[in-house]
Amino acid sequence: MSSIKSYTIGNELGRGSFATVYKGEHVASGSPVAIKSVLRAKLNRKLLENLGSEISILKQMKHPHVVELLDFQETPTHFHLVMEYCSLGDLSFFLKKKKELSETLPLVASLLRRYPSNTRGLHEELVRHFVHQLSAALEFLRQKNLVHRDIKPQNLLLCPPSLSEMDAQNANLYGRWELPILKIADFGFARILPASALAETLCGSPLYMAPEILRYEKYNAKADLWSVGAVTYEMVVGKPPFKANNYVELLKTIEQSNDVIGFGREPPSEDMQDFVRCLLKKNPADRIGFKEYFEHPIIANKQVIGSGEELDRSQLDPRMYISEYIQEADLPKLDLDREMDSFSQKRSTQKSSPKNSTNKTLSSTVKNPLLELTSPSPGSSLLLTRKNESLFLESEYVVVEKRQVEVNTLADELAREPDERRPSSERRFSLTYGAPTGAMARALSMASARLLGEKKNGAGHGSGNGSRNGSGNGSGNGARLSAGAALSGTSSGTSTTGKSPPVPATTTPSLSEREIVETLEEIAAKARSIALLADVKYSQIQDDVDNPDMNLPDSVSSSIAEEAMLLYVKTLSLLSLAMDQAGAWWSNNHKDNKMVSSHFNEIIQWTRSAFNESLERAETVKKKVSSGTTHTTAEKLIFDRALEMSRDAAVQEISGDFTGCESAYTTSIWMLEALLEDDEDGLGEEDRRIVERFISSITKRLVILRGQQE
């Protein structure tokens, strides 16, 4: 048994992506505690900020219905948050396992006998009790101008009931004294939000997330009220009010409901139905405010109500965790960070070829990490198929080698072209904002076209074609794009090849060549944005020989390696697409001995270099991937990171860092545009629409930003 100062660390209670919670014990008093241990090496700047926010907020929290932070300790490898121990687990576990618990724990059995339910949910009196306690905590947060932003059943923890009505009154508890005590936990996403303020961040759990957040609109503390409505509905009915496989379907389901909320064959009281419906209004302006909320008949009386009879506390050991009352084989581990909840964590074990993958979504279709690359069909570049026997880069598969040979052959042929046959460039190329013929200007042009519903004519390489007229929307500010800085927080970034892909020269090539050059630049920019994300993950799993204790655990390293591998495969797919198009154009024009610009050659050489390095790194990270079912897709990784970058950009914009936020906005647009490239295993129509919607939303912010700088 390990320990930290004043505490011993016992069995694991639950595990998430960034933290593990253990049952602990205070050495001097023997009191049980929960110890949330966070591995330092897994935290980037944003996660450190969230952890710091949680700690600072919890230090202020002294309320009977808020989980208390008892102590905070740091070691060279971990942060340890010593929390109040809630032995009955979380509300989600209780709802799902109440039948099994009633068979092994008399407390739960007597509770359900006293308050039987005709639905998969809970008896209405029990729901009211929990809602009273949740509302008391919410009112406390409101007084401190705090919005939780992640209210969900997994963050509502339960403790055994008070021993007496007097004890409940002395502790200032709400609800019925003889029933379990509910407490709000996990303030990692919480923030100070004055009543007049609006936030622009997307966080929390989608199934309980307000639609204004799903729509990536500004929101205020009313978002918490939606979450309370969703949680209350689940307690009453036994399932969330809206279910979906991804963000797209979830938002679509909410919007199509038109605020019509059904409760099934066993509806609760009219008051309860009205309460939930007042909260689950898709338009926040139609949703009740906090004044009306606290005045609603369901909430009005939150004080302790004595029903007189204590529940059966026999066999209840305050030191035992709820899971210990059920056979271990039947118990899944408590998941601490279900930000995507059930729809984003679905596992797909069905094996199918890409040709059958017509409805792949951003988050629900999960590929096996054991992949191989198959011969690309026209226009589809590298396609992925599932294969249990081998990893996709095993040496016996000659497809990748064949693609590498083809890429290098074309690049070598162009490299041998005499310099005198190429028009010279007046300057070296860099990926900049403001240049009317630049790739960034066309990114804004593409996004603006989506925003206005216009169609752009392109070379047919995918749905993300840019403007071919070279006009763009450049303001001439010349602010240099640093996607690496936006991704990694450094002052300057490096691409897969250590430099930016080239962008147009000041000389104007012939129309046909200009078209192919612009097409290649766009694909290169998309590939570069994905490669940068892969490179960040690549750097995270490099072993530190001098400090082996700082290396990530194998399971964590394998997971990150798997993500890097998927991203490098996506990068290779885009780069291969670029070379396919370049090769086709070169074949048609070289026979006429037409002169080509040096810029055409430069972008081919950059693409070749990026392809080779991405392939090499993919082979490296592949060695760290353990066998088993993958937990994500490249599409989801790219989608999530693009939204995270745009959210960070909004924060930078508020702080006045216009160059930094412009970089983040434009890079996120490129990443989302990369998702729209057509291939046989591409996005479904619904997913394409949601990606286009986010591109339009981010473009609005970018246009406003540039307007402010002019």
From Swiss-Prot:
Organism superkingdom: Eukaryota
UniProt GO molecular function: ATP binding; protein serine kinase activity; protein serine/threonine kinase activity
Annotated protein name in UniProt: Serine/threonine-protein kinase ATG1
Residues the record marks as active site: D150 (proton acceptor)
Subunit: Homodimer. Forms a ternary complex with ATG13 and ATG17.
GO biological process, one term: regulation of autophagy
Keywords per UniProt: ATP-binding, Autophagy, Cytoplasm, Kinase, Membrane, Nucleotide-binding, Protein transport, Serine/threonine-protein kinase, Transferase, Transport
Keyword Disulfide bond set for record: no
Record's subcellular location: Cytoplasm; Preautophagosomal structure membrane
